[in-house]
Amino acid sequence: MVVLQGVAKSYNGTAALSPLTLHIRDGERVALLGPSGSGKTTLLNLIGGVIKPDQGAVTLDGIDVASLHPGRELAGLVGVMHQQLDLVPHLSVMHNIMAGRLGYWSLWRSLVSLVAPQEKPMVQDALLRVGIPDKLYERTSHLSGGEQQRVALARLLAQGSRVVLADEPVASLDPARAEDLMQLLTRIVSESNKTLIASIHTTHLARAYFTRAIGLRQGKVQFDLPVVKLSDNILNGLYNLSEGPAKAKA
């Protein structure tokens, strides 16, 4: 379970997140909604251990994220899919996927893998699961945007994290490819009973692929409810900065 207890974060005296408390159960698929600057990325970075809260605590299965080593300890619990993907363009698909294992390897094994790839069967299986098994030796820069998204997802599979964080995972894709990736992402996390927490800018994707929606505006939680209760009225209120959002009970 992911728990944020009284968590707050500010930058240069400006609140990015006001104190909030959230409990996210194992296997949930949670969509973070809200206008730009609402605190979605800050919330993901807190859960992922990228930044520390100014107050409160973030725990994963009862373990304080701030106490975890950013290598093996954190990698086994949290995997992150950034909008920029963080792939190395000049490296092969295989080497980019193996990067998901670096948190588990010694420095020596990591260096050896550059010339003698490690755990190749695992990499092949990850590519098979994301639907591009023939791209193993392809240079990553030669792939389409959709294929690069799948490589980033395969790297998450290789990492083996129990919680997957995705920051606008389909922002750079056209509608058809966005649907394809969301279908693939949610299928994989569901099959593995992983927890998915993603910031999403397209509300119909939140309704179609997630079980729970959390609305943020100006660093505050405006609603937290099952997606089946996510009405147009609630969404219009969230994105209309001149009016307060309609409230909903979970």
Provide a role label for each language-model segment.
Residues 48:
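Helix-to-loop junction immediately C-terminal to a conserved catalytic motif
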Residues 64-79, 113-116:
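ABC ATPase NBD coupling module
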Residues 109-135:
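Conserved ABC ATPase "signature" region
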Residues 139-143, 147:
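Conserved ABC ATPase signature
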Residues 164-167:
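Catalytic Walker B motif of ABC-type/P-loop ATPase nucleotide-binding domains
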Residues 175-177:
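Helix N-cap at the start of a conserved alpha-helix in ABC-type nucleotide-binding domains
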Residues 200-201:
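H-loop/switch region of ABC-family ATPase nucleotide-binding domains
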